[in-house]
């Protein structure tokens, strides 16, 4: 029976009064806008994604010049003046620069025409690891592929003292390490860097937010960003409530009557249990409406995950067999060869259950198991995902002991190199009981999936990095070729999320010859070979969606709470069990041996990835 759950948190909407504190001096300067009149960017649909527009953009004036629209440079005389000029010049450029691979008909449909409104992107936690590794590289990639408007401006908020120029140098060094486009396009970076300012302030200081509000108003006037602002919280989760409240007190949540929007992106983890998630949802709801809130889970931005819905609902051959009558079980694996990468303090507070099960794994499960939404709108999609999570059977302590396995890695070898155990990692308790591996058998109580187990596993320091969804179909009712088949196995559909994103279908086929010899063969699709283009990074996809106001791939308040109501009983049952026997698996292996028993007792086994 599906579990019962407390009433969801109410999310009243209110906006706190603007701060009475006097504004402190602005920390940062703003350059003038491009030469063209403010307005939406023109994107020629004949140009593939990543193809630069015709004609170089004018550099912005130095930061030392007055911040007035009058200081903008005049338009280039040789720039295209009509859409016809633009199309002719673009076509000539394409013929000279586009490889023949672009003629692949599968590339049709890859061309994006949507560009966000002019806006200011406000990045909290700009000096942190997430901002440097993921957020800024994603913004740079969107900029260099012309998917951000000319009026785009990035305001980086942090507590450390930086000048604009010094912080730009820091970001440039990070791009050299973490950008997926190497070497860095110097012209594109210089153009983007001129739109970056640094704003210093403590997250709990009202005066810093008042100064930030003035800073953003100045940019609005100079760059024509129309009051559109996206606040990205790339900070420690403990800072979320304070930042949200201060944004409300400073009036930064107010949307303009003339259409200017305000949105906030909140990173995971969203709470550390059901109670804290409900409390955080309430705090967010006091300032922002639900339609303004984008709770990000980067796994939902991965290409194969996004393709899962297309695969299911745009092809007539799969959905009729996507049910308990044809599917034997489902496996979802998230394997990481890395350890905790210096994040000992963070992982001691989360563990695999909070870090992966509550979000990534349950999100993947819900996309596999959901019913077709009535439309492809955000709320219709999320309604169906919530129904799936609500239908997952709640576990008693006895069921947790039977159907959930936790583990922690000890010393071992990964990729031919010795590695330390979790308890030897920096900032980790030498007697830590934090799990770095979790495997679970979950059941969904609904008409489509009743009786079909979903096996989920995630682990650190496993032999390889791989994420996969495997749909194991049932055997044929009568095996005609059992005697001739070398290794008769049921059909399997595997969706590789990382690396080498793609889809594989396994089926039996006759070996050429005079006899009837059956072997397993595969049909394999990979994005790189089919479309001859790199898939975008998940953060590029999700940031662009947030800027466009598309919440389809972001989690809703009730969705987060339902997921925590699955994980909380597991953590509570572990607390009653006492100390686990850790470490329970060597680094470089596939986890504790007892995890195999989850499947073996029912005559199944984990798929070899």
PLM feature segments, named:
Residues 2-3, 80-266, 270-609:
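Secretory/organelle targeting and membrane-embedding segments
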Residues 6-69, 74-81:
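N-terminal intrinsically disordered, low-complexity tails
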């Amino acid at each position: 029976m599906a579990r019962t759950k407390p009433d969801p948190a109410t999310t009243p909407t209110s906006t706190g009064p603007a701060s009475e504190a006097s504004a402190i001096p602005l920390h940062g300067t703003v350059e003038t806008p491009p030469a063209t009149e403010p307005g939406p960017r023109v994107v020629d649909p004949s140009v593939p994604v990543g193809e630069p527009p015709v004609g170089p953009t004018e550099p912005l004036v130095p930061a030392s010049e007055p911040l007035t629209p009058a200081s903008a440079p005049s338009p280039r005389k040789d720039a295209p003046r009509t859409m016809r000029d633009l199309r002719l010049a673009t076509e000539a450029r394409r013929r000279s620069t586009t490889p023949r691979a672009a003629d692949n008909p599968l590339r049709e449909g890859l061309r994006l025409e949507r560009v966000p409104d002019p806006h200011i992107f406000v990045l909290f936690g700009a000096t942190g690891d997430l901002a440097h590794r993921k957020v800024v590289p994603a913004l740079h990639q969107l900029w260099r592929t012309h998917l951000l408007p000319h009026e785009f401006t990035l305001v980086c908020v942090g507590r450390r003292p930086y000048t604009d120029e010094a912080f730009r140098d820091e970001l440039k060094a990070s791009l050299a390490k973490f950008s997926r486009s190497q070497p860095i396009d110097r012209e594109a970076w210089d153009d983007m860097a001129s739109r970056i300012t640094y704003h210093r302030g403590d997250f709990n200081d009202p005066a810093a937010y008042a100064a930030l509000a003035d800073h953003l108003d100045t940019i609005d006037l100079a760059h024509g960003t129309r009051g559109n602002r996206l606040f990205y919280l790339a900070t420690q989760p403990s800072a979320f409530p304070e930042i949200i409240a201060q944004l409300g007190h400073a009036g930064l949540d107010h949307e303009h009557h003339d259409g200017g929007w305000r949105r906030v992106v909140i990173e995971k983890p969203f709470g550390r249990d059901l109670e804290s998630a409900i409390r955080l949802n309430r705090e967010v709801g006091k300032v922002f409406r639900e339609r303004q809130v984008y709770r990000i889970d980067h796994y939902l931005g991965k290409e194969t995950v996004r393709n899962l819905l297309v695969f299911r609902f745009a092809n007539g051959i799969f959905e009729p067999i996507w049910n308990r009558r044809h599917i034997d079980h489902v496996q979802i694996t998230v394997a990481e060869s890395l350890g905790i990468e210096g994040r000992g303090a963070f992982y001691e507070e989360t563990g695999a259950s909070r870090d992966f099960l509550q979000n990534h794994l349950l999100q993947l499960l819900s996309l596999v198991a959901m019913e077709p939404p009535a439309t492809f709108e955000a709320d219709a999609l999320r309604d169906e995902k919530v129904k799936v999570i609500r239908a997952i059977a709640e576990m008693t302590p006895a069921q947790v002991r039977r159907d959930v396995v936790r583990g922690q890695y000890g010393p071992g070898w990964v990729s031919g190199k010795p590695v330390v155990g979790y308890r030897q990692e920096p900032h980790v308790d030498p007697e830590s009981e934090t799990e770095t591996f979790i495997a679970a058998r979950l059941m969904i109580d609904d008409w489509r999936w009743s009786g079909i187990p979903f096996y989920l596993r995630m682990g650190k320091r496993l032999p390889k990095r791989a994420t996969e969804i495997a749909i194991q179909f049932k055997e044929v009712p009568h095996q005609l070729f059992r005697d001739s088949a070398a290794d008769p196995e049921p059909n399997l559909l595997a969706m590789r999320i990382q690396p080498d994103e793609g889809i594989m279908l396994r089926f039996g086929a006759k070996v050429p010859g005079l006899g009837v010899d059956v072997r397993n063969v595969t049909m394999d699709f990979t994005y790189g070979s089919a479309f001859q283009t790199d898939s975008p990074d998940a953060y590029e996809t999700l940031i662009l969606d947030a800027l466009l106001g598309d919440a389809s791939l972001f989690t809703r308040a009730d969705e987060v709470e339902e997921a925590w109501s699955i994980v909380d009983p597991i953590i509570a049952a572990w607390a009653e069990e006492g100390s686990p026997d850790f470490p329970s698996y060597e680094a470089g292996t596939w986890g504790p041996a007892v995890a195999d028993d989850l499947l073996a007792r029912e005559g199944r086994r984990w798929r070899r990835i």
